[in-house]
Amino acid sequence: MAKGQSLQDPFLNALRCERIPVSIYLVNGIKLQGQIESFDQFVILLKNTVNQMVYKHAISTVVPARAVSHHTASDRPQGERPQETTEE
């Protein structure tokens, strides 16, 4: 997994698994609404009355309808430990 996707994938997956409604704003200002059905490295499949495949490069902002918790132990790959802070 690319380092830049270490936050994106768990966030989108939490939205998908919990079926949280989202507003997706595109770079041209258009607002799309629905639930995330699926996603991959390049696209998000958004479900409302119809399914829409939205390319990630066209997305400005993803706004969940409610708070989502996406940093749980189950989101980390096996063997990866949470970052520890050290005081010097």
From Swiss-Prot:
Gene Ontology molecular function, alphabetical: RNA binding
InterPro entries documented for this protein: Hfq, LSM_dom_sf, Sm
Residue ranges, compositional bias (Basic and acidic residues): 72-88
Claim: RNA-binding is one of the keywords in the record: yes
GO process annotations (BP): regulation of DNA-templated transcription; regulation of RNA stability; regulation of translation, ncRNA-mediated
Keywords linked to the UniProt accession: RNA-binding, Stress response
PANTHER family noted in UniProt: RNA-BINDING PROTEIN HFQ
Family as reported in the entry's similarity comment: Belongs to the Hfq family.
Physiological role: RNA chaperone that binds small regulatory RNA (sRNAs) and mRNAs to facilitate mRNA translational regulation in response to envelope stress, environmental stress and changes in metabolite concentrations. Also binds with high specificity to tRNAs.
Designated name of the protein: RNA-binding protein Hfq
